[in-house]
Each structure stands twice: as structure tokens, then as C-alpha cells.
Amino acid sequence: MNRSLAASTAADRYAPMAAVTGASGFIGRHLVVALAQAGWRTRLLLRREPDEAQWSQLRPQVVVGSVGDNAALARLVDGADAVIHLAGLIKAARRRQFFEVNSDAAAALARTVQRLAPAAHFLQVSSLAAREPTLSDYAASKRAGEEAVRNILGPRATVLRPPAVYGPGDRETLLLFQLARQRWVPLLGSQDAVVAVIHVSDLVRSIVARVEAPPCGELLTVADDRPEGYRWTELLGAAARAVDNPAPRFVQAPQSLLYGIALLGDLARMAGSCSMLNSQKLRELRHEDWSVSPAELARPADMAPRFNLDTGFADAVAWYRRSGWLPP
């Protein structure tokens, strides 16, 4: 082993350890890179051994298991300096499935941290949807998970509620750019609705900064340089510019069509299938206030977002095109 590699390996042993759930997801993949760049070692809870090429440069420790496996949770958090809980369920066929993952598993992880890593800073990445728990089973389960974690860990826990997150690798917001390529662009949400967003790179920078700060039991969120949010015409207009559609024409999607699609989703859910659009998701989509207030905003004065809406959407589209998800 050469001297520089030996010194690096020795230094790594003394770097702080972050235990991460949900590392294989969209946000998680970006977060693991950001943690490594900030000098953290990482220990990841994954359902299976990862593809070597995906993680070879980052050299994470891997615990194979799930958030429902108490033994795996114990191996994950033992001796960790920080625990970042990203894992969650965004679609499910049954209400109890949302609660098993988004609430019960979060509580189990918090209890494990309390027992095996009591000095660790626990950071739970929740969702802005938790602010409106009556809208859907998903929102209610995220709210229940927040409350469970805060009840168990008190001031050792920080809860972060991101708004809509987009960026390279995200399949959920890909639909926005696919719609924006059309001559007639349908508006899915209410004309008066406002939606806050954040680029995934800015989100993970905020997570790292927050977990490096002392915990104090906060419940916060993050956003780009417009925390008050965007109207749907602004979001789709920016998406159209990013995909080189110079003159999109916006048309309000007929409510009857949206409700018809949602009804099909409800029927599929009753039959035990997961559907991304159902009546509950439609209520979330058409909710009029997904803005972030100044009191909720977690942004240190020296950490301005690196991406505004136009530069962030351009970055996402460039990645989609390189990856073949959007045509050139």
C-alpha cells in the first residue's frame, strides 16, 4: 500500500460515521455522494448487496436487510455518529402498508438509536405532505412517523420536510418534462395552487449541513430561492424552456378526466395493486398551498441554493437526455 493511500485509509477510520436508510433511492444516491465529499464514512441499509460499480469509489459499509428487520437496524446504527432516515413508501395498496413503513419502521429505528447510539444526531427526511395529514394515507403516515420519532428521541431528532424534489435520476418528475414537450401542455393542478420545489443537490447539501449541526428537536423544511412556491404555469413554462419548447400553450386538464383516472386508480388499489394516481394522490396534487413559510425554512444564511428553477430544470433535462430518458 502506498503512503498516500495508507494515510487516507487511516484518516477514514477516524471520520464520523453516518448510518443511512433509503440509500438506493433517488435522494439517497445523491446523499451518499454528498456525505463522502463532506468527509463522512457511510453505513447503508440495503435490501441486497449493491452493484460494485455503483458504490466502488465511495466504499460504504453495507448492512443487508430492511427497515422491518430489527437485527439489521441494530447493525446499522451501532456506534453511528449520525443516523439519516430516508426510507419511505410513496405508493401502496393498503393504508396499513403506508403506516408499517412510514411510521412503525421509523419508530423502530428511533428506538434502536436510543438504545445503541444515544449520542447520535437522528435526522428524519419526511415530506411536506406531512403538514396536511388529512389529504391522504401517505401524508397521514408521514405525520405519524414524525410524531413517533420526536416522542422517542426528543431534542436528539431533527425532522426535515422537503417539498417536491427533482433532479438527475428522478423518475417521478420526468412526467413534467414529457408533458412540457407537447404543443398543448395540460395543467394538472389548480390554477391558484403554489408548489415549492428543490433540486436534489441543494437538498442533500442541506441534509449534510443540518446533520453536522447540533440537534435541537427542530421540524423544518427546505426550498429553492422561491420558498413561496410556483404556480403550475410557471413550473410547466420552465419545464418547456428546458426541453426547448418555445411556445407552449397551457390548457387546464378537465376535472372529469383527472377524476376518471383517479377512480381507476382507486379500483386498482381495492384490488390490491399500487397506483400512483388515485383520489388521494389527486387531492395532494390539487392542494392549493405547498409553499414554505419563513418560519419553516431551514437555510443557513451562508447556504444559498445553487440551482434556481431554470438552471435546475436544465440540469435535470441534460441528465435525462444523456441517459436516454428524454429524446435529444
Question: Where do the model's predicted regions map?
Answer:
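NAD(P)H-binding glycine-rich loop region in Rossmannoid oxidoreductase-like domains
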Residues: 60-104, 128-132
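Conserved C-terminal active-site "lid" loop/helix of NAD(P)H-dependent oxidoreductases
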Residues: 200, 219, 261-305
